Amino acid sequence: MIGMTVAVAAGPAQAQEIFGGILAHDVDTPLTKGGFEDGADLQVGWRGERIDALRFIGAPSPYVFGSLATGGETHFAAAGVSWRIGGRLFVRPGLGVAIHSRDDDGVINNIRTDLGSRILFAPEVSVGYQVSPKLAVEAAWVHLSHAQLLSRQNPGMDSIGVRLSYRLR
């Protein structure tokens, strides 16, 4: 998490935008078996300029963010690429990887919930609205998972909430 803080502090000079939000932590969804941990995720991060060299896949923007779990269980840092699709109303799918802080014992309330690996896939999607030229609000979903590559047990972990983003340029 310290490295994440340094990256976020150093990044805004080259970032297209910074963002932050609050998301419900470890939400139980029809696709996952969440709800083992309580609290919220406090997220802060930045997104860079579009990568023109990756134009053949839509010129995504790099991002990095840290997520602090208020319940004290599983904090994580993630990095990846995302695509902003649309105008004032937009969708932003993203693909990334995350490293989390949870102990490897994988047992909470006598239920096996291991995440399978310290490093996980971290897909995300948000739906947003550009409030002004510099400010946008997003409804965001972030999923952590090893995609059953490391074991058959893969409950994953979902966070769902709201983010605000601020364009620096």
Model-inferred region functions:
Residues 18-22, 44, 62-66, 93-95, ...:
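Membrane-embedded beta-strand positions of outer-membrane beta-barrel proteins
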Residues 18-30, 57-70, 143-145:
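Transmembrane beta-strand segments that form the barrel wall of outer-membrane beta-barrel proteins
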Residues 22-27, 31, 94-124, 128, ...:
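Outer-membrane beta-barrel translocator/channel fold
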Residues 11-16, 49-60, 85-91, 134, ...:
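Short loop/turn motifs that connect adjacent beta-strands in outer-membrane beta-barrel proteins
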Residues 36-42, 73-77, 119-123, 156-160:
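Residues that define the transmembrane beta-barrel architecture of outer-membrane proteins
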Residues 42-48, 79-85, 95-97, 125-131, ...:
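Residues on the lipid-exposed face of transmembrane beta-strands in outer-membrane beta-barrel proteins
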Residues 17, 131-169:
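Predominantly the C-terminal beta-signal and adjacent terminal strand-loop region
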Residues 30-32, 65-67, 109-113, 147-151:
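Extracellular loop and loop/strand-boundary signature of outer-membrane beta-barrel proteins
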